[in-house]
Amino acid sequence: MKLVTFEKDGRSAVGLLNAAGTAVHPVPGCTDMQALIGIWPVLDTAAVLRGEALPLERVRLLAPIPSPAQDVICLGINYFDHAKESESVAGKGVKAPDTFPIYFSKRVDEAVAPGGDILSHNDLVADLDYEAELAVIIGKAAYNVAEADALDYVFGYTILNDVSARTIQNQHKQWYRGKSLDGFTPMGPWIVTPEEFDVRKSRKIQSRINGELRQDSTTDRMIFHVPYVIAELSQGMTLRPGTIISMGTPAGVGMGFDPPKWLHPGDVVACSIEGIGTLTNTVR
């Protein structure tokens, strides 16, 4: 099932997308995804799907979680091909993790909606980059969970573009600031629930810039997979419902080309994951 956050007549709401992908069924009394996560175990989805239906073209999709309660937890260098690519970039290489994942956080003032603008910050940034990523949404509090049970704590999956300012990212050694400027977190177009998206299956993950294929990989090329990451993060640290974990990006980012292929105002960035859909945004 696909779950959306949308705006109609100036008001935001959440709903279920019908099977054809043509209409949204609002969830009565539920104005944001965090609330939907809370009632999801008891929600009568069949009743919602029998209720009011809004044509998809008459609503404006928002990021599924427009204002995350916490910073996004991100993984760095978590695809084998991206690890090789990163090591080849002179002066900027980071060796692939072989024992433990690389974690960092990404501040999100407001996630960018599907069709929304990526801010170029031309006054600060000369090397704007894109990163198509699978994002995991936690559905119930996870603490000291076993890897075998980790997927029981997942609410759903979406696409996140981990937009990055490379010079700032590397100037500060820690990646936080270079990943966290306003307009650097496109997310969407919706959340897909686990019964529709089995994360254990390999899925195509791609990005295109102005129609040109840049990233083209599969999720089985991850170094550390979703169950392991949830289990490890939960050891001694509670993952609350609504926590977002972004699983890293494959090769084909702009910095990996010679010369680099940075983003510029007017560029259209499309990130796709098989089984979820496509998240499209324009650089402004």
Language model region names:
Residues 4, 62-64, 91-94, 119-128, ...:
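A generic local secondary-structure boundary/capping motif
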Residues 1-97, 101, 268-270:
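N-terminal non-catalytic cap/leader segment that marks the start of a structured domain
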Residues 112-150, 155, 160-164:
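Non-heme Fe(II) oxygenase catalytic core, chiefly the N-lobe of the double-stranded beta-helix
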Residues 91-112, 130, 264-275:
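Structural signature of FAD isoalloxazine-binding scaffolds in flavoprotein oxidoreductases
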